[in-house]
């Protein structure tokens, strides 16, 4: 599940103030899984928010990216990147309208008591019932169609954006984003075994 393209959230042309090695850094959000990345940018380039960059495996196509440093969390973003993220996510969602409209048409229950739609902000039992009834009559065709057919329903793009941000901050369920990377738990015996096996490899 690797990202191919991403949009710039923030750019530090002089790098991080506290970094030992100062190099131009960009914070990027993937267009497919909304993965948050920290990347080193090639020298003498200028970037701005919402610039689209190739971040896939083909190194020859990476015209502006020197290398991907790491996947980062929402909390690790700069204040500037956090201020841009909502509008950038909206832009991505609008560009993938068919996929997200199909989510409303195809999503199903998580359990006996809960439906995927109820994970969206401001979607309670009444809205859930209304959406299911409407899509049974006719599949939704666009964001505009959803808004027009659902009385008192907020802008679906805003609702989806809020859900993506919630997942990026950390959530029990992940509908649209990649779950956080699992880091090894160094507790008791597991910690000792990890370092013992690592020592053998050396």
Where are these regions (language model features)?
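Small-residue hinge/turn detector
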Residues: 124-125
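Conserved hydrophobic/aromatic packing and binding residues within compact polymer-binding modules
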Residues: 128-131
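C-terminal extensions
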Residues: 91-116, 133-202
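Structure-specific DNA junction-binding interface
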Residues: 1-92, 187-202
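A structural connector/turn signal
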Residues: 42, 115-118
């Amino acid at each position: 599940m690797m990202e191919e393209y991403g949009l710039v959230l923030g750019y530090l042309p002089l790098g991080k103030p506290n970094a030992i090695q100062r190099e131009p850094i960009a914070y990027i959000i993937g267009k497919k899984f909304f993965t948050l990345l920290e990347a080193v940018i090639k020298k003498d380039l200028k970037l701005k928010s919402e610039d689209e960059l190739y971040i896939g495996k083909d190194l020859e196509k990476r015209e502006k990216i020197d290398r991907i440093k790491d996947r980062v969390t929402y909390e690790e973003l700069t204040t500037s990147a956090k201020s841009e993220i909502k509008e950038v996510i909206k832009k991505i969602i609008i560009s993938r309208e068919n996929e997200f409209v199909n989510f409303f048409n195809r999503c199903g229950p998580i359990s006996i008591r809960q439906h995927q739609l109820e994970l969206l902000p401001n979607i309670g039992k009444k809205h859930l019932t209304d959406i299911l009834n409407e899509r049974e009559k006719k599949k939704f065709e666009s964001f505009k169609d959803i808004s027009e057919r659902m009385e008192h329903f907020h802008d679906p793009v805003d609702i989806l954006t809020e859900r993506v941000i919630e997942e990026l901050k950390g959530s029990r369920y992940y509908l649209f984003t990649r779950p956080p990377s699992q880091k090894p738990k160094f507790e008791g015996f597991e910690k000792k075994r990890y370092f013992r096996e690592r020592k053998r490899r050396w």
